[in-house]
């Protein structure tokens, strides 16, 4: 199939340039003004911005095992609606992808249902228990984007050391959910701060995150493993990672839109404000923003975690942990970081597209020769975040009702038109 994106605006070295993008059989074959390119599908992108498709290295697509929350079909459609062309799917599934046979179940669903590039993680431990026998990383590494027990921390230094050694031998990456449950009281639901104390809710202390990061940095220094920290939320974590990078440790990390735009001051006793790790203090939020700007935090990942409406209807105490975010990430960050002057647009695109591609060795982009990974946005939109417009099964977002000034109009992934809200000439 031949596709032409006509008269879109591309940001190059700080300047907008009107550009056509020609795609043939899923590959970018030409870029330039007024291209002569006979195409089966021509999309008029005049007035819209063209970006490399976004990459999220931390999403929960829930299938196999929990299709009442999300499916590969609904989740990948939601990703395309958010401008994403590649996502890495976490392994807290049933069965957990801890063997060739179990991984094949997820791969078959991806092959049959995904409208974008979905890359599975395998679990670090058998059954994704955070302890005990490790998965056969050497056998699985060629079929996965990395290894994670996300949703659980790896419990002991001995288990993590062995995992790092095997991961390094397999030339893969560990994406670590850093959470030491020994720090968390029964019923821990939100940050151990003023809101928790005022409302009598058991709190989750910052130590539960930064202590295992501190442990793993030492192990990473020892083993040389490629290591990535998921959903960083505390100022101590940022400081530890900044120092480790200065020492040459092979470490990267991510944070999420909700940690950049919200803190515990914004909490309401609603399930849509409950996620793990929780919203922290204002000084944690400020440290995350500083880390994002100085490169300590390499990328933005949504930790898109859909649940059923019933599971999110029990307030902060009783609701399941997790919020959705894949459809709102760029509109929110563009509106509240770029338009407010807190962050250049080029940096936001790097943190959402280029940096995760580099670290996780993911092909695709907008240059000639790339596998086509392009998203088209209207940066003059005036919309309010409305969960009823989501393609995800999950609707729990702390940003419901927020005004945003960006809207996805088209997403192209390889030879697929993954999302289309443009009028089309044929």
Language model features with spans:
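Alpha-helix-loop-beta-strand connector modules within alpha/beta enzyme cores
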Residues: 100-117, 166-176, 328
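Histidine/acidic residue-rich metal-binding segments in metalloenzymes
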Residues: 132-300
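C-terminal cap of metal-dependent C-N hydrolases
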Residues: 8, 315-318, 368-426
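His/Asp/Glu-enriched, well-ordered alpha-helical/loop segment
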Residues: 198-226, 293-294, 298-300, 305-377
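Active-site loop-to-helix "anion-binding N-cap" substructures in soluble metabolic enzymes
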Residues: 64, 89-115, 122-144, 152-156, ...
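Histidine-rich, glycine-flanked metal-binding segment
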Residues: 1-53
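Metal-associated gating/positioning segment near the N- to mid-region
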Residues: 46-113
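Divalent metal-coordination and catalytic microenvironments
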Residues: 8, 26, 47, 58, ...
């Amino acid at each position: 199939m031949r596709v032409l994106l006509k008269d879109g605006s591309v940001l190059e070295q700080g300047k907008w340039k009107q550009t056509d993008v020609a795609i043939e059989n899923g590959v970018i074959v030409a870029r330039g003004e007024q291209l002569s390119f006979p195409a089966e599908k021509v999309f008029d992108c005049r007035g819209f911005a063209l970006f490399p498709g976004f990459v999220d290295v931390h999403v929960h697509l829930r299938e196999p095992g929990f299709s009442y929350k999300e499916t590969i079909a609904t989740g990948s459609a939601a990703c395309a609606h958010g401008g994403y062309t590649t996502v890495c799917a976490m392994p807290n599934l049933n069965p957990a992808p801890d063997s060739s046979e179990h991984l094949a179940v997820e791969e078959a669903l991806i092959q049959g249902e995904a409208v974008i590039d979905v890359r599975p993680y395998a679990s670090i431990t058998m059954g994704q228990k955070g302890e005990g026998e490790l998965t056969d990383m050497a056998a699985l590494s060629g079929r996965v984007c990395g290894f994670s027990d996300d949703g659980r921390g790896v419990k002991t230094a001995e288990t993590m050391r062995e995992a790092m050694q095997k991961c390094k031998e397999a030339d893969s990456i560990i994406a670590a959910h850093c959470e030491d449950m020994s720090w968390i009281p029964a019923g821990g639901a939100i940050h151990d701060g003023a809101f928790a104390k005022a409302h009598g809710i058991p709190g989750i202390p910052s130590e539960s995150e930064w202590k295992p990061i501190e442990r793993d940095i030492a192990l990473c220094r020892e083993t040389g493993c490629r290591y990535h920290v998921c959903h960083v939320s505390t100022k101590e974590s940022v400081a530890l990672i900044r120092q480790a990078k200065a020492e040459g440790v092979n470490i990267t990390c991510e944070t999420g839109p909700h940690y950049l735009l919200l803190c515990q001051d914004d909490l309401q006793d609603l399930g849509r404000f409950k996620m793990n790790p929780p919203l922290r203090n204002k000084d944690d939020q400020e440290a995350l923003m500083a880390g994002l700007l100085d490169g300590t935090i390499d990328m933005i990942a949504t930790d898109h975690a859909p649940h059923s409406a019933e599971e999110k209807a029990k307030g902060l105490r009783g609701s399941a942990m997790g919020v959705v975010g894949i459809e709102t990430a760029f509109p929110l960050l563009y509106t509240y970081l770029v338009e407010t002057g807190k962050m250049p647009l080029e940096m936001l695109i790097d943190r959402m597209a280029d940096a995760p591609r580099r670290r996780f060795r993911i092909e695709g982009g907008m240059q000639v020769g790339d596998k086509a990974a392009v998203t088209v946005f209207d940066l003059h939109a005036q919309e309010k975040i409305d969960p009823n417009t989501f393609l995800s099964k999950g609707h729990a977002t702390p940003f419901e009702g927020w005004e945003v000034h960006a809207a996805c109009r088209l997403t192209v992934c390889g030879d697929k038109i993954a999302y289309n809200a443009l009028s089309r000439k044929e």
